[in-house]
Design a protein with these regions (language model features):
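Cytosolic, long alpha-helical scaffolding segments
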Residues: 1-193
Length: 195
């Protein structure tokens, strides 16, 4: 019995790794789609979101099966529940990627103002989120509390960047009222990126 649950836990961790990679790629594509307003790339993110949702359901089902069939206790139960929580959060990040891609798909501007992107530090925010995801995955794989703690430091940097965004956008809207709708929609993108 112990050997069976161990193999199931290894498979579950492998599935979480695959889901993590899928969501990372979704966020990366969505970020690129926003920065370039590439509607085709944004559409790819929307199409792949169905795969993220299906994968989440499969992992949920696998977790239920492990609990029902093997009745894990102690460390195994904590591991299974942690994988369930990670799976839920990854699916939520996939939803955020979809929301970011929708902005790129529905934006009426031909391109984002490069100066605005620079002031908002949008590229830096996207890179920071992707870095946080990589670091969190590495922390899980290596079971490193130190790496997990480093994710929080990166989150503080995102907070700092995001804190200035509203004032920057308000100033931009006052100087470019024709872009007000896109700027207001960009606020929601920033909140999604800020996760």
């Amino acid at each position: 019995m112990v050997k069976f649950i161990e193999s199931e836990l290894v498979l579950l961790k492998k599935e979480i790794d695959e889901m993590w990679t899928l969501v990372y790629n979704q966020l990366d594509r969505a970020g690129d789609a926003v920065l370039t307003l590439d509607r085709e790339l944004a559409q790819q993110v929307l199409v792949r979101e169905r795969r993220v949702n299906a994968f989440e359901l499969k992992i949920d089902s696998d977790v239920e099966d492990i609990i029902a069939l093997y009745n894990p206790v102690a460390i195994d139960l904590r591991f299974v529940l942690a994988m369930l929580k990670i799976n839920t959060n990854l699916e939520r990040l996939g939803d955020f990627a979809e929301g970011i891609a929708r902005f790129a798909l529905n934006c009426h501007e031909p391109a984002l103002d490069t100066e605005l992107v620079k002031q908002l530090r949008l590229e830096e925010m996207i890179a920071q989120v992707l870095s946080m995801l990589e670091l969190a995955k590495q922390a899980l794989q290596e079971e490193s509390q130190e790496l997990a703690t480093a994710v929080f430091a990166k989150d503080n940097m995102l907070d700092e960047i995001n804190a200035d965004a509203t004032a920057i956008l308000a100033d931009y809207i006052s100087r470019h009222p024709e872009s007000a709708l896109s700027c207001l929609n960009l606020v929601s993108v920033l909140s999604l990126i800020h996760i």
